[in-house]
């Protein structure tokens, strides 16, 4: 990528860093992890959780959500100005699961947000530690990406459900900052922009007045983020057109959908980070591991090593398969919802199946679910190999893909050819090539038609043995090409509902 030199690495975004060298970055990411771990330990003490209960992923999610809610200033202000019955704007809480007399019980806890903020700051040497908060948001986002297929959201904005591989980060809150923007897929950015344009079409005052100026600058900023994710001049030029439009409307929506479709073959750069649940960091810190001193990276071997030595449990519903639940969480931990399943199976060392074949629902348990028959089991989050996370889309070529998901967005920098269903993608590009963007459209279509199936992405890159910490001996995997490569294949995953 040409502009790579001007970009901060995503560890710097993660830690609000000015330019830092690799050692400083590893230390500041480590410091962030330490803070999350210390906070988690303190919360387990407050809630009187046993070691086992503290390693339960459902408890981890509740505790993470509590601190995110305590620091959500806009929502907190909104709640205070619009009081609703039975909701105390100053309190936050959720379900905590405890083992009582040999069975799992749900207990709803409620805390002052002020108290949670105090505990969080204390764990983070008095700072607000926004990087740590964003880290937890990205973990939740990765878990959503693995659990739900956002068909409805795609259809509502006029996009095609088969474009789900572009939807990474679609449930990230707006306040997730630069680190959040880095992990958003092309489709996510396009969807945010289309929603904005639609509001402008329906509400005459949306772009006007004092507020309209802020709206406009947010619009242009989002266009620039999206432009920065594209890797070809024509796609970027198209984003300039959309950004400079005097009065964004249907023409811009058309252009955005066109550019999103094109990203199925001419993939954008989307960052991937392994963000783990707080219940992994807590026990590691309490066992005396010093992340800041040792250094930590979200994109190298560190998360793999940490998961190799972690014990995490999950509640399991009566008809769920614990191995499938493990796969779901493993994929979320490595931000791998849209990666090629054949590569994931190779790295994990066990077969990774498409979402529709998994007998498991989401990790969170709804408040109306019956606890009587809940069991718990260990999540198997270990891997056979490790690989470096990528922030590029890899170059492009084609291969048979599926009815559900017709392209992948690579997570790991490992040599392979990237599957996508060229005939299906190209079929969407007949017709409209007139208008302001016609030359760019023609150029983009020409590049897509030139994409070759035998081209290899990430040439020479491989996976590594877990003993190979310095990544000296890459192992280039070989794949069974007859296997299905897409996770959301002709899928029946539940929809994501806020």
Swiss-Prot record:
Q: Where is the composition biased (Basic and acidic residues)?
A: 8-21
* TM annotation in the entry: none
- Say if the entry is tagged with keyword RNA-binding: yes
Q: Where is the protein situated, by its record's location annotation?
A: Virion; Host nucleus
Task: Write out the residue ranges of the motif Unconventional nuclear localization signal.
Answer: 1-18
Q: Which InterPro entries match?
A: Flu_NP
The UniProt entry annotates the motif Bipartite nuclear localization signal at 198-216
- Listed GO cellular component terms? helical viral capsid; host cell; host cell nucleus; ribonucleoprotein complex; viral nucleocapsid
Region of interest: Disordered: 1-21
Q: Which UniProt keywords apply?
A: Capsid protein, Helical capsid protein, Host nucleus, Host-virus interaction, Ribonucleoprotein, RNA-binding, Viral nucleoprotein, Viral penetration into host nucleus, Virion, Virus entry into host cell
An example GO biological process term is: symbiont entry into host cell
Q: How is it modified after translation?
A: Late in virus-infected cells, may be cleaved from a 56-kDa protein to a 53-kDa protein by a cellular caspase. This cleavage might be a marker for the onset of apoptosis in infected cells or have a specific function in virus host interaction.
Check the record and name the SUPFAM superfamilies matching this protein: flu NP-like (SSF161003)
The superkingdom of the source organism is Viruses
Give the record's subunit note: Homomultimerizes to form the nucleocapsid. May bind host exportin-1/XPO1. Binds to viral genomic RNA. Protein-RNA contacts are mediated by a combination of electrostatic interactions between positively charged residues and the phosphate backbone and planar interactions between aromatic side chains and bases.
Protein family (similarity comment): Belongs to the influenza viruses nucleoprotein family.
HAMAP family assigned: INFV_NCAP (MF_04070)
What is the protein name for this chain? Answer: Nucleoprotein
């Amino acid at each position: 990528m040409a502009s790579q030199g001007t970009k901060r690495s995503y560890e710097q975004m993660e830690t609000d860093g000015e330019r830092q060298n690799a050692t400083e970055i590893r230390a500041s990411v480590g410091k962030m992890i330490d803070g999350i771990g210390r906070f988690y330990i303190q919360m387990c003490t407050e809630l009187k959780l046993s070691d086992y209960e503290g390693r339960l992923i459902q408890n981890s999610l509740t505790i993470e959500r509590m601190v995110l809610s305590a620091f959500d200033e806009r929502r907190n202000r909104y709640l205070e100005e619009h009081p609703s019955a039975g909701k105390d704007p100053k309190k936050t809480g959720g379900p905590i699961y405890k083992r009582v007399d040999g069975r799992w019980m749900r207990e709803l806890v409620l805390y002052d947000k002020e108290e949670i903020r105090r505990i969080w700051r204390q764990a983070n040497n008095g700072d607000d530690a926004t990087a740590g908060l964003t880290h937890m948001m990205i973990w939740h986002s990765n878990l959503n990406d693995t659990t739900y297929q956002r068909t409805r959201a795609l259809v509502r904005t006029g996009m095609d459900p088969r474009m789900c591989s572009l939807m990474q980060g679609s449930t990230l809150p707006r306040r997730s900052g630069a680190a959040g923007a880095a992990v958003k897929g092309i489709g996510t950015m396009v969807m945010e922009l289309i929603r904005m344009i639609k509001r402008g079409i329906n509400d005459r005052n949306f772009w006007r007045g004092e507020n309209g100026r802020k709206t406009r600058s947010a619009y242009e900023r989002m266009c620039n983020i999206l432009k920065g994710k594209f890797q070809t001049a024509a796609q970027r030029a198209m984003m300039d057109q959309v950004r400079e439009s005097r009065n964004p409307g249907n023409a811009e929506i058309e252009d955005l959908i066109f550019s999103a479709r094109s990203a199925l073959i001419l993939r954008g750069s989307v960052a991937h980070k392994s963000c783990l649940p707080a219940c992994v960091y807590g026990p590691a810190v309490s066992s005396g591991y010093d992340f800041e001193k040792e250094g930590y990276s979200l994109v190298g071997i560190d998360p793999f090593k940490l998961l190799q030595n972690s014990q995490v449990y999950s509640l399991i519903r009566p008809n769920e398969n614990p191995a499938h639940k493990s796969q779901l969480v493993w994929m979320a931990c490595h931000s791998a919802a849209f990666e090629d399943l054949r590569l994931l199976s190779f790295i994990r060392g066990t077969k990774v199946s498409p979402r529709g074949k998994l007998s498991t629902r989401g990790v969170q348990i709804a408040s109306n679910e019956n606890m009587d028959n809940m069991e718990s089991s260990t999540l198997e989050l270990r891997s056979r190999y490790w690989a470096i996370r990528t922030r590029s889309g890899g170059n492009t070529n084609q291969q048979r893909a599926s009815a559900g998901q017709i392209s992948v967005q690579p997570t790991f920098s490992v040599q392979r050819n990237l599957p996508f269903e060229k005939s299906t993608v190209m079929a969407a590009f007949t017709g409209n090539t007139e208008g302001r963007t016609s030359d760019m459209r023609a150029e983009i279509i020409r590049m897509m038609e030139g994409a070759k199936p035998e081209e290899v992405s990430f040439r020479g890159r491989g996976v590594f043995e877990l003993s190979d910490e310095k990544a000296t001996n890459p192992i280039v995997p070989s794949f069974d090409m007859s296997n299905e490569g897409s996770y959301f294949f002709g899928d029946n995953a539940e929809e994501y509902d806020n």
